[in-house]
């Protein structure tokens, strides 16, 4: 029995040693924890009105604690409509290498979802924001987390949540953690909908990244929102990559970008919040629905190695500055 015990221990060590030769050593998390997050499934109207009567649900977050001691900075990673994909893992390793822990949320599995690309109506567009604030509650009390240095980063639908989680109005309604995110880093977010008081954002930097060729969530709309935010004196910047389409940082994406005929996009819609809690299709003057004629299919998605590398370089430099890393 002793020899069997020794074999069982030695084999993982051999495998780990082999992996360590391929993965930069600092990219290996010192510890990984899975945390349950108690949240709600809400309609957009419920979210916008602060209505807590949604369906209780438990989602999961993967906390990868970077190598280091004491309390470390954390980047919360929020996936998009396709779920927890390869880019989340890549970013986790890249950030761990800097000495930054990561908390990657899976907002779908606990809700019985795998993706909403082909049916965006399955989940409220802003529901992820509640998940993110609840994740803050988990992190704020964790002994290995510096609660003053928690950054939010999200992709596509998760980028939309990242961007609008900065709104002071939404923080007042839903953030009960006692802390705020130190910065917001949305990747290719949906900026299509003006919300009431949407220029009143947290006094924290916002850095948006997207591609000129994005026909899922056009960056032109984000640039217009950025101009409104700047006019209001906010610290916000947008970085645009001319050759990049949607999801350009996913290393398993199509090369070149390919059409996904079943995926829904609101790129042709003009949606706005007219009265608190009510999203209106500006063309029909009726409440917006994903059955509206403006909703189209077939955006391009694909990996752009050059844009992905440039974005990694920019994000790392930004995080080093905002988190005061040595």
Label every model-predicted segment:
Residues 208-210:
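Short beta-strand/loop motif that positions the catalytic acidic residue
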Residues 218-228:
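Short alpha-helix in the alpha/beta-hydrolase fold that links the catalytic acid
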Residues 48-62, 71-141, 261, 290-300:
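Serine-hydrolase catalytic machinery in alpha/beta-hydrolase-like enzymes
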Residues 12-20:
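Hydrophobic h-region of N-terminal signal peptides that target proteins for export
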Residues 235-326:
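C-terminal catalytic histidine-bearing segment of alpha/beta-hydrolase fold enzymes
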Residues 2-10:
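Sec-dependent signal peptide recognition
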Residues 21-69:
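N-terminal cap/lid segment of alpha/beta-hydrolase-fold proteins
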Residues 124-202, 213-216, 220:
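Primarily recognizes the serine-hydrolase "nucleophile elbow" in alpha/beta-hydrolase
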């Amino acid at each position: 029995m002793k020899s069997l015990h020794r074999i069982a221990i030695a084999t993982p060590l051999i495998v780990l040693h082999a992996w360590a030769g391929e993965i930069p050593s600092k990219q290996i998390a010192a510890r990984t924890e899975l945390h349950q997050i108690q949240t709600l499934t809400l309609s957009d109207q419920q979210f916008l009105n602060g209505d807590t009567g949604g369906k209780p649900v438990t989602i999961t977050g993967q906390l990868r604690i970077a190598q280091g001691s004491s309390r470390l900075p954390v980047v919360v990673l929020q996936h998009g409509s396709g779920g927890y994909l390869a880019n989340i893992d890549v970013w986790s390793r890249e950030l761990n290498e800097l000495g930054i822990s990561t908390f990657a949320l899976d907002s779908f599995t606990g809700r019985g979802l795998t993706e909403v690309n082909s049916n965006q109506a399955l989940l409220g567009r802003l529901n992820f924001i509640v998940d993110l604030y609840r994740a803050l509650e988990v992190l704020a009390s964790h002994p290995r987390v510096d609660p003053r240095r928690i950054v939010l980063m999200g992709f596509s639908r998760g980028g939309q949540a990242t961007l609008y989680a900065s709104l002071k109005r939404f923080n007042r309604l839903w953030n009960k953690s006692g802390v705020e995110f130190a910065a917001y880093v949305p990747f290719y977010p949906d900026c299509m909908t003006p919300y009431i008081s949407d220029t009143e954002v947290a006094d924290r930097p916002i850095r948006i990244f997207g591609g000129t060729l994005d026909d899922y969530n056009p960056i032109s709309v984000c640039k217009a929102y950025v101009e409104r935010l700047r006019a209001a004196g906010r610290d916000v910047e947008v970085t645009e990559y001319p050759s990049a389409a949607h999801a350009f940082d996913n290393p398993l994406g199509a090369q070149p970008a390919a059409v996904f005929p079943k995926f829904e996009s609101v790129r042709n819609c003009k949606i706005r919040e007219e009265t608190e809690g009510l999203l209106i299709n500006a063309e029909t003057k009726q409440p917006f629905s994903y059955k509206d004629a403006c909703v189209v299919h077939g955006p391009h998605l694909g990996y752009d190695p050059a844009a992905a590398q440039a974005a990694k370089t920019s994000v790392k430099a930004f995080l080093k500055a905002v988190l005061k890393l040595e």
